[in-house]
């Protein structure tokens, strides 16, 4: 493997950074292997799943930021974080893994993934459910948020990648 970064070549070590390495968002239920363009598990695009280990940290960070933005948007559409510190305290107390660099709506989704069936009073966890979604159980709410997250990722893929591929294919046929 060739190292092109002159800072690495001169010192023999990778450049120091204060940024944490981006971990794979894979959750072990990949649907790209059965033909989906967007994974139903982690919501990455199929080419991102395939090439993830070859991505630079900046490329991984770009994907991570897009995913966290979509998840936050899907979650904020149905819930409001009313006490960020309480939510974070509950995550820490319950030993729920979350990325501190993501916003509180991503944290909330991690809480719902870990314990939606055990939460009877969302206010004690620092959030409330919007009235239009209050008739759902937190498990159903979590699943709806996850579905919205996938829809946002799929719409982004369809708008910015699949459309480009259509035009590229047409140009190649001419």
Task: Name these PLM-found stretches.
Residues 2-76:
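N-terminal cysteine/histidine-rich coordination modules
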Residues 76-130:
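Short flanking/linker segments adjacent to small metal-binding domains or redox-active Cys/His motifs
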Residues 126-141:
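Short cationic/low-complexity microdomains
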Residues 152:
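Extended, charged alpha/beta regions that create polyanion-binding interfaces
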Residues 158, 164-166:
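Metal- and O2-centered redox machinery and metal/ROS homeostasis
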Residues 167-172:
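Conserved small/polar residues in nucleotide/adenosyl-binding loops
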